[in-house]
């Protein structure tokens, strides 16, 4: 009976000591994986930030082009009313008093140069 107890005690001590070693090993392994995960997350975060900055630059570029085009479209064309005191004329147009049509409105219109 004593040999059974000694054998059981020996197996128990070995299991506990090896289990502790595995636990420490697992803890160290998890720390390494966590550190690797952090570096991967930092890399992914930087990559995402670069993509967002590129997208923002494209959107701002499109907005500036759109506003530039819309300004040109507002006064493009002949016969559009304008202000005689406002020097902002579109290229190729000049703000003049109408000769025949529109004289009853008492305003100036864009005409081609």
Swiss-Prot record:
Subcellular location: Secreted
Entry keyword annotation includes Manganese: no
Propeptide residues according to the Swiss-Prot or TrEMBL record: 22-74
Signal peptide: 1-21
Top-level taxonomic group: Eukaryota
Disulphide-bridged cysteine pairs: 75-90, 82-95
Alphabetic keyword roster: Disulfide bond, Ion channel impairing toxin, Knottin, Secreted, Signal, Toxin
Pfam families: Toxin_22
Region spans: Disordered: 61-83
Tissue distribution: Expressed by the venom gland.
Gene Ontology MF term list: sodium channel inhibitor activity; toxin activity
The keyword Ribosomal protein is annotated on this UniProt entry: no
GO CC terms in record: extracellular region
Domain-related comment: The presence of a 'disulfide through disulfide knot' structurally defines this protein as a knottin.
Function: Probable ion channel inhibitor.
Stated family: Belongs to the neurotoxin 14 (magi-1) family. 01 (HNTX-16) subfamily.
Name of the protein in its database record: U11-theraphotoxin-Hhn1o
Organism of derivation: Cyriopagopus hainanus (Chinese bird spider)
Lineage: Eukaryota, Metazoa, Ecdysozoa, Arthropoda, Chelicerata
